[in-house]
Amino acid sequence: YLFNGESLKLITRDHSFVEELVRSGVITREQAETHPQRNILMRAVGTSPFIKADTGIVEWKDGDIIMLCSDGLHGSMNIRLAEEILSSESNLLTACDRLTDAALAAGSSDNVTVVLVKNAGGIGA
């Protein structure tokens, strides 16, 4: 996800079985949220010595935050709550803790992983 100080924007897509079903029109995004096979991965890092990585270009401005997270986070909590946490917390470590706590409080039954990286400007920004 990319957080621009106001809202989170999904900048990747899941490599899951249900995402393939959604993309092919077999099921809706709403049906995918409760599909019994929603956690089946079609591609993942560490499953093979060779992986196919998706690449792209995203405008990343000074102050923007990239949020990498597992489905234990994004699959269990409201996106608006994540935006509220990122808007109100300037310390990234504390924001990670708060996001993790919120996902667990929302009932996540999966592992919860979150990494935040902030563009602090400077060379290469």
Language-model features: locations:
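Short, charged, surface-exposed loops that flank catalytic or proteolytic processing sites
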Residues: 87-95
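Residue-level structural signal for beta-strand termini and adjacent loop
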Residues: 6, 13-14, 82
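Conserved beta-strand-loop-short alpha-helix elements that form
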Residues: 40-49, 56-85, 100, 104-106, ...
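Intrinsically disordered or compositionally simple regulatory linkers and C-terminal tails
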Residues: 122-125
